[in-house]
Regions:
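Short linear sequence motif anchored by a di-proline
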Residues: 1-193
């Protein structure tokens, strides 16, 4: 488990950032939990700003069924398989939150304290006529470290366009994400014992 392996998505708040949302995308792809291999909503650069599209989560590995679902911010530029995506096909993955499991396989939900949507940095590329994406991860901050040593690279709302700017990308790759709110199912269950 390398960090961020399931995300939760709801549409309403994303419409405030991306004005031109295809209603078909809205109905089909904001259904709740999204897993690797699922099609997920993504935000990408367009002529008029930012636009919403969909993309399948996970780069296929050549030897079989396994997928690469995350890319480390610290080493992404050194990996030939990621180079084209990070340089030319950066995207944002909007989500209401994401799930992470601790060493005891207990599920934790992470979301923002201050906003209903978090924006994860990522990139995509083409594999046999199909576009696929990965989510960028970075070292866990204080809000995450007790559960996992990695976390998604989360951008602030004011940085969304910066992610598509080659001059600002490198700085974003090294930033520490915002502190997140954690809700743990196992802690909630224990209240009712």
């Amino acid at each position: 488990n390398k960090g961020c392996s399931q995300i939760l998505c709801k549409a309403d708040e994303i419409e405030k950032v991306v004005h031109d949302i295809d209603q078909r995308i809205r109905q089909e792809h904001f259904a709740g939990d999204i897993f690797p291999t699922n099609v997920a909503p993504i935000i990408e650069k367009s002529e008029h700003g930012l636009k919403l599209d969909v993309c399948k989560w996970g780069y296929p590995l050549s030897q079989g069924k396994n997928l690469v679902i995350n890319a480390r911010a610290e080493s992404v530029m050194d990996k030939p398989s990621f180079r084209n995506g990070i340089l030319y096909h950066r995207i944002l993955i909007p989500a209401s939150g994401f799930y992470e499991w601790n060493r005891l396989k207990e599920k934790n939900t992470f979301s923002r304290y201050d906003a209903p949507v978090l924006y994860m940095a990522g990139f995509c590329d083409w594999f046999e006529n199909e576009r696929r994406f990965v989510i960028m991860t970075t070292a866990a901050n204080e809000s995450m470290i007790k559960v996992h040593d990695r976390m998604p690279l989360i951008l602030e709302k004011g940085q969304l366009k910066d992610w598509f700017d080659d001059r600002k990308m490198e700085q974003i790759l090294h930033q520490v994400p915002v502190q997140l709110k954690r809700e743990a199912e196992y802690e909630q269950q224990s209240l009712f014992l």
